[in-house]
Amino acid sequence: MTSTDSHLAIAASRKAAAFATYDDELLKNAPAFLGLTGLRVQRPSEIISELDSVVRSTIYQYREMRNTGIERHRVKSIKEVELDEFINAKHAEKPQSWAGLVDGALSLPDRFEINQIRDTEGNSLAIVISENAGAHVTKLVRFRVARRLSGTRLGNVITELIASQPLGTSNTVGIRVVKLSDPFPDSSLLLACLRRGFQRFDKEYFRVLLPGVWEHAQMQAALRELVSEHCLPTELGDAFLQLSKDAASGDIASTQRLEALIHPGKVTFGKLPIYVVPIQPEWAQELFDFRIWSRPLLRMDTRLVVNPDSVYYKKPRNSPKGDFARILWYVSGDKQRGGGCIRACSLLTKGVTGTVKDLYREYQRLGVFEWRHLMDHFGKPDAPAFAMEFTNTELFPTTISLDELNSILVEDGMKRQQFVSAVEISQAAFEKIYQQASQPE
């Protein structure tokens, strides 16, 4: 064994991400090493060029969050809040003023609600103090990530998490305009809010939540009502109305954008394709909520989808066409393990075809899967694969069994399906499935 071989073996045994070499023979066999060990054999220049994505990435690798137990928790006592983690000393905030704010909010539970994101040890990761400011308005009085997470990758994903789910994942909040009223919001959180559906107008940030299924006329009436009641600025209301018109005219990109902005709402108009995509139970556990590894699959009291964005790899056959679609996740397998039913819905934002190794290199930071998962499924690095980028995953409170699903499809004029691969369904079938799955158990 040469010195290079020895170092390569050590790198593989220690689960290194990459091995740098000028050895042409090793470089020629790089795909084989990747397939066998998950170790990327590359020239030093290639590693340096990818250093930003491999080492200095600001995007948290979701698979690192497995079993972290991160959860959203309603605060009931001021003792539960680590005030020092959220005080903005730069703007001369004082512990006394924060204590007064928290104490006052707790004394008015019908008007205020305080939620924290915490880890398994009870450490505060983020805080959301919200105020019911009217029939359709919720103000985010304080909306902050803990100072201990500043500059960390975990801090960045928690930032994306609360920006995407300011009021949690509940589908029962009703029509709401969420207004960011924190006097000193962090700039990175503001940017995340803009990525996650907030709209900026006159130095203020607004998010429109329209849960449920909406017809075009019904949505337009609801938006006009929000404007007339001064819940939403006229200019933003007009922009939403125009977007809904564009969607109703058949523009798929506008429909996708509209549903991203009103999440978790869905629309009956537009031409957004819908697919039922099968997924194995263990992969569903990886993608939807890391806390379920030690619990029954997708417990319906789960209120937190930790990864706002993710990627799922499948074989190219019968894959969704185009970049925009709705995905209904059919968890396959044994009913005893939580399979054999529809459990969640997501918004497809991009579909890419390529080899397993190329797609893994592109999406490893976004996905939760390790290389060995892909090798178990696809067999070899050069196998063709299809990567589905998706976001806005919604866990249903009620599952739809295979028999119930097929009854809906047969009623819609389709044949019964076993869902061994992705199946496109109609808007009418989707509405029935979605409305039934959205009902409380």
Model-based region annotation:
Residues S150-L167, L191:
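Conserved acetyl-CoA-binding loop-helix of GNAT-fold acetyltransferases
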Residues A17-A18, D24-D110, I127-I129:
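Acidic, PIN/NYN-like endoribonuclease modules and their adjacent C-terminal/linker elements
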Residues H136-L149, I175:
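Conserved acetyl-CoA binding element of GNAT-fold acetyltransferases
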Residues Q116, G122-N132, K139:
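Conserved beta-strand in the GNAT
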Residues P166-P183, E204:
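Conserved GNAT acetyl-CoA-binding A-motif
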Residues S188, L194-T302, G340, G351-E441:
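Contiguous surface segments at macromolecular interaction interfaces
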Residues M1-A18:
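Active-site neighborhoods of divalent-metal-dependent phosphate/nucleic-acid chemistry enzymes
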Residues P316-G333:
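Short coil-to-beta transition motif at edge beta-strands of beta-rich domains
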